[in-house]
């Protein structure tokens, strides 16, 4: 495990200097989920949520969040993203339904896009919660995690279990 690089000689936080890092294609995939009641599932899949098309709004929110990551996370570098994609799928559980959210972010640059993918997935989930909370505040968000990342000096990472 490498040492932390976000501290200066005085032990204070700093933004890491990435000037000399090589530009490479970098991709990160993150996942999260929102577990909802049957009522919310039925209304979402029939586009009957009063606030509108939940998945369409969540998708746009996720893309916007990826682009704003550096504004939210203090030592995150502002990046020129080349692509952001959000995918949704449903998993049925015993007495609930799980919306699985997958965010994929891509760039060509000198630092990775893991935080952008995690932020995109998280804001998607928060948007789903916001749009459905009038029906049930008991929705569960998470877990949220990095599935895979490619590019850069540290190379390829793939989560062992997904």
UniProtKB/Swiss-Prot annotation:
Binding site for substrate: 75-77, 115-116
The EC number(s) this enzyme carries: 4.6.1.17
Lyase listed as a keyword: yes
Enzyme class (EC, first level): lyase
Entry annotated with the keyword Metal-binding: no
Alphabetized UniProt keyword annotations: Lyase, Molybdenum cofactor biosynthesis
Pfam families: MoaC (PF01967)
Molecular function per GO: cyclic pyranopterin monophosphate synthase activity
InterPro entries: MoaC, MoaC_bact/euk, MoaC_sf, MoCo_biosynth_MoaA/MoaC, Mopterin_CF_biosynth-C_dom
Pathway the protein contributes to: Cofactor biosynthesis; molybdopterin biosynthesis
GO terms under biological process: Mo-molybdopterin cofactor biosynthetic process
Reaction catalysed by this enzyme: (8S)-3',8-cyclo-7,8-dihydroguanosine 5'-triphosphate = cyclic pyranopterin phosphate + diphosphate
Catalytic residues as annotated in Swiss-Prot or TrEMBL: 130
Subunit field text: Homohexamer; trimer of dimers.
Family membership: Belongs to the MoaC family.
Role of this protein: Catalyzes the conversion of (8S)-3',8-cyclo-7,8-dihydroguanosine 5'-triphosphate to cyclic pyranopterin monophosphate (cPMP).
UniProt protein name: Cyclic pyranopterin monophosphate synthase
Species lineage: Bacteria, Bacillati, Bacillota, Bacilli, Bacillales
